[in-house]
Amino acid sequence: MKKYRGEMPIWVFVEVISFGDLEDLIAFYAAESGWESPIDGKSLDRVRQIRNAAAHNNCIINDLRPEEASERNVSRTPRFITDFVCRAGIGENMRKKKLANRRINQIVHLLYVYNKVVTSENTRNTRLTELYDLLHTRMSMHKDYFAGNGLLTSTHEFFVKLTDSLMDSH
């Protein structure tokens, strides 16, 4: 940091600021320059939420349980997210149930933002292949353990369909 002496390149600055500050930087730059961000602020905020949950070792699988009415997302799922999930061939019933869950909604936003922002084909393919392997190989290794748990199996199926769709689209 000292080596830049007040003239830090933006890519270095972005590496050291908090996620919240990154959100503010994007909003500021868009307002000042007229640039249109490829992602909206709410999606970026949902990415921040899932990132923070993972960074603080929250057990995300516990958050997959059906939520009480008081816990549900008060804001509606944006149309572009619904369309994103619909393009994966996920039916309306599953789509509504899964997107009503806060954690699943955050992960879907993360995948949407990734799909919009990462333009390097090599990077996209590498990470999507890792996600594909996680869902199709690692998580399926002992699927008989979870066969009786409809919540886990349906959530797994949901993310398999979404990931397969992302793999097929590129």
Predicted features along the sequence, with ranges:
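Short, contiguous, well-structured surface segments enriched in hydrophobic/aromatic residues
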Residues: M1-P38, I61, V113-R124
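Secondary-structure capping and boundary motifs in well-ordered enzyme cores
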Residues: G6, I39-R46, L99-Q106
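Contiguous, well-ordered alpha-helical segments that form the cores/surfaces of helical PPI scaffolds
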Residues: V12-V16, D45, N52, V108
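Short C-terminal domain-edge/linker segments immediately following a structured domain
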Residues: G34, R48, D83-R87
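Histidine-centered, metal-coordinating catalytic motifs and their short helical/loop contexts
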Residues: K42-L64
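C-terminal, helix-dominated tail/subdomain
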Residues: A69-M167
